[in-house]
Structures are given as structure tokens and as C-alpha cells.
Amino acid sequence: MRYNEKELQALSRQPAEMAAELGMRGPKKGSVAKRRLVKLVVNFLFYFRPDEAEPLGALLLERCRVAQEEPGGFSISFVEDLSRKYHFECCSQEQCQDWMEALQRASYEYMRQSLIFYRNEIRKMTGKDPLEQFGISEEARFQLNSLPKDGRTTCIGSQLNVLD
């Protein structure tokens, strides 16, 4: 995917849903964990040097997996290349759990699946389609049959490193 660098930098300045200094290690073999300011903004995970305002890079959180690593750590790997894995070290297991949950909720796919679930629950309770009033109830992206075959909701990301 191609992104406008200025737009990404502007997005990185928006209020973060979560932000913290974490240890971060990239996917290259032999890479060492470095302290990075990590900010979750919508479905992008930006990372910065702690003393700089411009991001070093960003990860687009679509079609990726978040996994628990050693205690107090987690990783993000991408479906199209599972060997490309970013490792993060938190101050506590609680902080690690908070980050993992927030990252899993950040993807468009997770939000879409949640919308479909609640749409069907409302339809069962009221007998009415809540999206009908907006004229979008027949769009494919809002249909249950457009969900992945395995029904998994843990797949959340794709990568983006354009701000180097």
C-alpha cells in the first residue's frame, strides 16, 4: 500500500488511544530491543525515538497477529509474512495485556465483525435491521457471509514502514 507521508505524520500527532515507552525489537535477525515511544492511533501503531516528534515508522494493524511472548512481552507478525515479527517489552504483565487487547480491537476487520454481530443481535431483538435507515443494509461489507471462513477475530494487521 502507498501512503502520503505528510498525512501519516499528521495522523501520528493525533491523540493516541494508548501510548507508552516500550522496548521494541524489529524483525531483523540480531536486532536489539530499543526504547521507543509507541502510540496507537486508530489502526496505526507509530513508533518514535523518545526524544523526537517525528515517527521512525508505523505498522498498519490489518491482517496481523498479536501474540503473548515471554512474560511482559508480546509480538506483532503479519499474515503475509509470519517471519516478519516485531517484539515489544512492557513494564508489567498487566501493561502487556492492555496493549494486546487494544491492538486486537484496533483493526477495521475487528470493527466490521463487531458491527455485524451487534446488527444481528438488534435484528433478533427488534425484528428490524438497524442499518436499513441508512440505506446501507445490503452492502456486502455488512453481510455475515462476508466474514472469514474460520470466523477468527484475532487477525488484525499488515505492515507499513514508510517513515524511515
Curated annotation (Swiss-Prot):
CDD domains: PH_PLEKHJ1. PROSITE patterns: PH_DOMAIN (PS50003). Residues 15-108 form the PH domain. InterPro entries: Boi1/Boi2-like, PH-like_dom_sf, PH_domain. Pfam families: PH. Gene3D superfamilies: Pleckstrin-homology domain (PH domain)/Phosphotyrosine-binding domain (PTB). This is Pleckstrin homology domain-containing family J member 1. It comes from Mus musculus (Mouse).
